[in-house]
Amino acid sequence: MRLLSLAPDRPRRGGPRHLTSGSPALPPPPPLLLLLLLLGGCLGVSGAAKSSRRPNVVLLLADDQDEVLGGMTPLKKTKALIGEMGMTFSSAYVPSALCCPSRASILTGKYPHNLHVVNNTLEGNCSSKSWQKIQEPNTFPAILRSMCGYQTFFAGKYLNEYGAPDAGGLGHVPLGWSYWYALEKNSKYYNYTLSINGKARKHGENYSVDYLTDVLANVSLDFLDYKSNSEPFFMMISTPAPHSPWTAAPQYQNAFQNVFAPRNKNFNIHGTNKHWLIRQAKTPMTNSSIQFLDNAFRKRWQTLLSVDDLVEKLVKRLEFNGELNNTYIFYTSDNGYHTGQFSLPIDKRQLYEFDIKVPLLVRGPGIKPNQTSKMLVANIDLGPTILDIAGYSLNKTQMDGMSFLPILKGASNLTWRSDVLVEYQGEGRNVTDPTCPSLSPGVSQCFPDCVCEDAYNNTYACVRTMSERWNLQYCEFDDQEVFVEVYNLTADPHQLNNIAKSIDPELLGKMNYRLMMLQSCSGPTCRTPGVFDPGYRFDPRLMFSNHGSVRTRRFSKHLL
């Protein structure tokens, strides 16, 4: 299957004759421009003569792929070609367990409260005109292209509302992308429309030419063969899998017939001592609900087999073209997922490990094989890390994340964070759900059994802390209960026991203060020492206003 019209007599290497760029064409920069790029941006590059040897970067992004429930199990080739050839992170998190806010954080290196991207709608700033004007010029791909001279290639799902007529339609190509093959709106496998450098192309339901994961694989291989060889490249390939509707390729539709959703300790149990949205789930789940989520779990794994094929093809092509040894490859997901945990059928959005923890595998120059890192990283670190690879200083950006390139290269005596912020603004319907008339307005994502996965006051913020002594999660809800959840994940990895009422009050106060600090952080202040870091300083007076009242928690309809 080929998406690009390639000349039969075209050599297999060379400039992009038929790959037309999404923004104005990106020829190799003249020597003076290259010098300006080096001096003004990517200072890590040691001279124009070495520009062709700057590292390439590939970012592979899955959609809704969990880590906690075994989401990497189907990806045997991916684990062998990336994880075993480099580093696997066992503590990788997202700052918001929902597609658009998480993807916006990846692109910008910022927490949701600094983006005001709060959900998957235009009103929630997902690919809105405001996002396009304020944030897109400052994404790390835009910096790679404008300041570092990288060719930039995108293929797949961008943001959930991309292509909306009220926000430029499919003609909008975000600043910073040389080659643009973006899916209109949310993940599909057939019957979708792509923006090919700003021009719409419809696809049907013929597997050989339309199955989206394979389409993305083929157009990516074409880019590798027909790009310019005079400049480094960055590729972002964003697959639909394993997002619903979970349509597997024909050859994989009978795979994993004996696989079921994991029956771990928090499967199909009541969420005791948790906030009301979790407590409202019906326990035990009905047989029909369990059959549904088992089927969904199986189909999710089936769709990932095509992603595994994509990764294999990509790595083999990089090797064939002589570029593999000079290319960093990242594999991750935008959020986790749950299937029956605390009797919630299927979704993401919640604060628990299964929704906020994601796979992260990296290989590349200077990374030793077969490594596992326990260092606490987040998807806001991807942009800073990739810019660091390109030689661009994080200090020139307003990003909240940190570069973990030193971790990848085995730096010793490294000063690193001990906590990250997780924040989410709940969504609800203004009217009663017609399928569940007994429920009040304000809930959403409801299933036929009238179990709802979201609500207006499912709005929370958490500090996820990992240090030598502590493995904690502290969360506060913006609801009438003023609910707090705290978990010691060393003793309670499945988050069964909320210890908010039994934990040391002094520690609780420190965590509350740290949460407020992180919710108001921006740029460098997001990287200050956490509660358990040696450099941390706690002044309880800062928790009180001049009037002596306890400082209020920082929630608003825009998450700050």
From Swiss-Prot:
Binds 1 Ca(2+) ion per subunit. GO terms for molecular function: glycosaminoglycan binding; metal ion binding; N-acetylglucosamine-6-sulfatase activity. Keywords: Calcium, Glycoprotein, Hydrolase, Lysosome, Metal-binding, Phosphoprotein, Signal. It catalyses: Hydrolysis of the 6-sulfate groups of the N-acetyl-D-glucosamine 6-sulfate units of heparan sulfate and keratan sulfate. GO terms for biological process: glycosaminoglycan metabolic process. Ca(2+) binds at D63, D64, C99, D334, N335. SUPFAM superfamilies: Alkaline phosphatase-like. It is found in: Lysosome. Residues 1-48 form the signal peptide. Glycans are attached at N119, N125, N191, N206, N218, N287, N325, N370, N395, N413, N430, N457, N488. The modification Phosphoserine is found at S549. This is N-acetylglucosamine-6-sulfatase. It comes from Bos taurus (Bovine). The lineage of its organism: Eukaryota, Metazoa, Chordata, Craniata, Vertebrata.
